[in-house]
C-alpha cells in the first residue's frame, strides 16, 4: 500500500514537472503557428490593393496553403519518425518563419500564390509532431487532458491575434515598409526564434533531463 502511494506521488510530481516545463512552450509555439496561418487575412486589408491582388487570387492562395499542407503531411510525418519529433518541430518552425518573413516581399498574385503554397508545405506535420512528442513524455491516460490544455493556443491566438495585428498594421512606414509588411515580418520572426529554442528547451530523452530526479526518470 505504501509502495502504491509512493509511486502515485512520484508520478504526480513527474507529470507536474513535465507539464510546467514542456506544455507552456509548446502552447506558445502553436499560438505563433496559428497567428502566422491567419495573419494574411489582416495583411490583406491593405496588401491586396498595394500589390494588385483580387479577391479571387487571394482565395486561391488560401486554397493552395491547405493543398500543400495535405500533400506534405505524410512525407513530413515520415521524416519526423526518422529524425525525431523535437528536431522536426524545430525544422518546421524555422522554415515557416523564414517563409513568413519572405511573404512580406511578395509583389503580385504569382509570388503570393507561391508563398502560400510554401507556407503550407513548411507547416505540414507540426500538429502531429507535437502530439507525437507529447506521447513520448505523458502516459496515455493523461493525453486527453494534456491535448485539451495544448489546444488553448487556438482561442488564445484569436483573442490576442486581432488587436496585435491591428497594432502592427499601424506601424506603416517603419523602416520604409508598409504596415502589412511589418505585420508579416514581426509575426513570423518569433517562429524562427522558437524553432532554435526548441533544440535547447525541449528535452530529447529523460536521461539528459536535469530537472527530473532519478526516481522520476524511472
Set out the residue ranges of the language-model regions:
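Conserved MFS/SLC helix-loop-helix module at the cytosolic interface between two early adjacent transmembrane helices
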Residues: 71-110
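Symmetry-related core transmembrane helices of the 12-TM Major Facilitator Superfamily/SLC fold
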Residues: 181-200
Amino acid at each position: 500500500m505504501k509502495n502504491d502511494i509512493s509511486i502515485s506521488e512520484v508520478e504526480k510530481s513527474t507529470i507536474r514537472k513535465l507539464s510546467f516545463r514542456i506544455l507552456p512552450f509548446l502552447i506558445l509555439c502553436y499560438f505563433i503557428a496559428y497567428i502566422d496561418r491567419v495573419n494574411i487575412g489582416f495583411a490583406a486589408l491593405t496588401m491586396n490593393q498595394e500589390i494588385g491582388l483580387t479577391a479571387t487570387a487571394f482565395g486561391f492562395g488560401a486554397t493552395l496553403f491547405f493543398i500543400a499542407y495535405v500533400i506534405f503531411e505524410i512525407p513530413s510525418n515520415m521524416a519526423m519518425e526518422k529524425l525525431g519529433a523535437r528536431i522536426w518541430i524545430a525544422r518546421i518552425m524555422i522554415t515557416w518563419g523564414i517563409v513568413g518573413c519572405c511573404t512580406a516581399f511578395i509583389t503580385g498574385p504569382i509570388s503570393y500564390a507561391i508563398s502560400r503554397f510554401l507556407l503550407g508545405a513548411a507547416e505540414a506535420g507540426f500538429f502531429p509532431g507535437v502530439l507525437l512528442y507529447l506521447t513520448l513524455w505523458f502516459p496515455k491516460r493523461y493525453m486527453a487532458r494534456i491535448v485539451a490544455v495544448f489546444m488553448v493556443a487556438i482561442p488564445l491566438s484569436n483573442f490576442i491575434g486581432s488587436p496585435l495585428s491591428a497594432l502592427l498594421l499601424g506601424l506603416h512606414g517603419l523602416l520604409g515598409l508598409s504596415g502589412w509588411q511589418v505585420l508579416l515580418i514581426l509575426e513570423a520572426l518569433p517562429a524562427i526564434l522558437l524553432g532554435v529554442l526548441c533544440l535547447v528547451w525541449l528535452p530529447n530523452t529523460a536521461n539528459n533531463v536535469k530537472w527530473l530526479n532519478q526516481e522520476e526518470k524511472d
